[in-house]
A protein has these predicted regions:
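Catalytic domains of carbohydrate-active enzymes that cleave complex glycans
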Residues: 140, 144, 148, 152-189, ...
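Catalytic cores of alpha/beta
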Residues: 281
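Active-site clefts of carbohydrate-active enzymes
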Residues: 182, 248-278, 296-297
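Glycoside hydrolase catalytic-domain groove-lining segments
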Residues: 222-263
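Aromatic-lined carbohydrate-binding surfaces of glycoside hydrolases
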Residues: 2-5, 12-207, 215-227, 260-261, ...
């Protein structure tokens, strides 16, 4: 390949030698989801949800997600679906064009949620340390009451009917409540939460058979309630034996990063070397982790301009702003999302995870040995780009000969 460029000092020719390996990257061999903000899309691109302009812009965001091999999208349920409170009645058709837009873009599954909420303090902040949940769509209603139960049953029954009508019931992952075992003060508080969580899970499974419950967690303590476990990388390392046992049992374990960990830990923050965002996925391959979740694709709250400030405000009341770049991978350009280098690093990481999976199917011992030259755990690794490329090339050579 010859590329000829013109500079102000004269002409030069750049010769690139490219080695093409006879290896195809498996598509959708590794689960990836990045949560997005519909409100931020509307605000930055001057479109209104439910309009054709919004759907066209959403399609551009979906294409950006697919570029980095994202194959799952998250639709948060809101009170627009609630058409009556006495009796409880729900209508989800307003979500249909948006859901179809993502499936048309090539997505394979969707996340829905949530059923439960922590409620609010008197000052309006979320009640992060609560020992009991309220209904997510009706936050003035305690979940652990007969009326809360009735509300939730009617909600799930209506949702199940809607999903079956569109043929989507087998493509759903459901969040009951994000991080249910994080932020509590006493063991009794956690146990009270767990009892309510299991009740919600039983309602889901009764009226939407076959649904998979997915949740970001800190431990394996909600066994029997969760189907797809998503510990943070630090939580996984702290309880590696627990989560590895779940993997050996045949359960799905993914991972995520959010707010932390910082320092030498692998993460995708804006002030971290790009290679760390890619190595996150090498760690997934090494640990037999089947998916990656992140909360921040374009999470720009009101007043945040990612071109001027990179830290997202934290409204939970339990900490400072989120670290720089934690809340986004794309920038809101004039014609749609503009892709950043961190998205490209995540794209390569997802491709790598799929390729490592191919090698493990054929040569598991070699898979572990090669990965071990670069990755030990999520805070012990080699971030020398040359070494990474050397191991990557050996991976491709091995796959070519398989």
């Amino acid at each position: 390949l010859r590329l000829q460029g013109v500079f102000w000092e004269g002409n030069c020719t750049c010769i690139l030698e490219i080695q093409v390996y006879k290896v195809r990257i498996p598509e959708d061999a590794f689960w990836v989801t990045n949560w997005f903000s519909r409100e931020a899309i509307c605000r930055f691109h001057q479109v209104e949800e439910g309009t054709q302009g919004f759907l066209e812009m959403l399609g551009k965001y979906g294409a950006a997600m697919r570029r980095m091999h994202q194959n799952i999208f998250f639709i948060t349920l809101d009170d627009r679906c609630m058409v009556s409170k006495s009796p409880w009645k729900f209508d989800f058709e307003y979500l249909t064009p948006m859901i179809q837009c993502f499936f048309d873009a090539g997505m394979k599954r969707m996340e829905l949620g949530t059923l439960l909420h922590r409620g609010f303090l008197e000052n309006g902040e979320p009640n992060m340390y609560t020992d009991s949940f309220v209904c997510s769509l009706e936050t003035g209603l305690k979940f652990d009451t007969l009326e809360g139960y009735a509300h939730t049953v009617e909600l799930v029954k209506s949702l199940a009917k809607y999903l079956r009508f569109h043929g989507w019931e087998k493509q759903v992952l459901f969040h009951i409540h994000d991080e249910p075992d994080i932020h509590y003060k006493k063991p009794e508080d956690l146990e009270a939460r767990r009892r309510e969580y299991y009740l919600a899970a039983s309602i889901l499974r009764k009226y939407l058979p076959g649904v998979s419950v997915i949740e970001a967690v800190e431990s394996a303590g909600f066994y029997g309630g969760v189907d797809v476990w998503v510990p943070g990388t630090a939580g996984y390392e702290a309880r590696k034996e627990e989560f590895d046992r779940l993997i050996r049992l045949g359960e799905q374990v993914w991972t995520y990063v959010c707010c932390s960990p910082e320092g030498w830990w692998l993460n995708r923050f804006l002030d971290f070397p790009l290679i760390r965002g890619r190595l996150l996925f090498w760690g997934c391959a090494k640990n037999r982790i089947q998916g990656f979740l992140h909360w921040g694709f374009n999470q720009f709250p009101e007043g945040m301009d990612p071109f001027r400030g990179t830290s997202c405000p934290n409204d939970t009341g339990i900490g400072t702003n989120f670290p720089c770049g934690d809340s986004f991978l794309v920038y809101p350009g004039p014609g749609g999302p503009e892709i950043g280098m961190r998205l490209e690093a995540q794209r390569r990481g997802a491709e790598d995870a799929a390729l490592w999976g191919l090698l493990r199917e054929n040569e598991e011992a070699l898979h572990d040995r090669l990965l071990g030259e670069v990755f030990v755990n999520n805070h012990t690794y080699c971030q020398d780009p040359q070494k990474l490329e050397e191991v990557y090339e050996r991976l491709l050579k091995e796959l070519e000969s398989c």
